[in-house]
UniProtKB/Swiss-Prot annotation:
SUPFAM superfamilies: Ribonuclease H-like (SSF53098). GO terms for biological process: rRNA 5'-end processing. This is Putative pre-16S rRNA nuclease. It is found in: Cytoplasm. Its EC number is 3.1.-.-.
Length: 143
């Protein structure tokens, strides 16, 4: 059993996957969206990743505002998650992603990755943070 973690953005979707023991999250790739309004190719690529890694659940970052309200980005994310659930038949869990992009950017800065290169990886790293947060939650709830 593996879990897929996604960071859904207007231009890219960061993708991470858990190990089979559900302990760690690893980055897989960044799916580039050709057109923000057309999701077919994006969904098709994610379905390929689901099949390749034998995923049975999806954790999708949910971009609440800092004051815990839901804005337009939450609506778009929910629409994407609903499409994903319909197409794959898998459960989609919405996971609070506040500050994951900041944490991803900070971790890359600490490893010496230059600012212009960080943009390339921030969504994938954010997907890792989202999924790792969920995996840690699962681990703690089992203890």
């Amino acid at each position: 059993m593996r879990i897929l973690g996604l960071d859904f953005g207007s231009k890219t979707v960061g993708v991470a996957v858990s190990d089979e023991l559900l302990i760690t999250a690893q980055g897989v790739e960044i799916v580039r969206r050709k057109s923000p309004s057309k999701l077919r190719q994006t969904l098709a690529r994610i379905e390929e990743i689901i099949a390749e890694y034998k995923v049975d659940r999806i954790v999708l970052g949910y971009p609440k505002n800092m004051n815990n309200t839901e804005g337009e980005r939450c609506e778009k994310t929910k629409e994407f998650g609903d499409m994903l659930a319909r197409r794959t038949g898998l459960e989609v869990i919405y996971w609070d992603e506040r500050l994951t992009t900041v944490a991803a950017d900070r971790s890359m800065m600490e490893t010496g990755i230059r600012r212009e290169n960080r943009k390339e990886f921030v969504d994938e790293i954010a997907a890792i943070f989202i999924l790792q947060g969920y995996l840690d939650y699962l681990s703690n709830s089992r203890s």
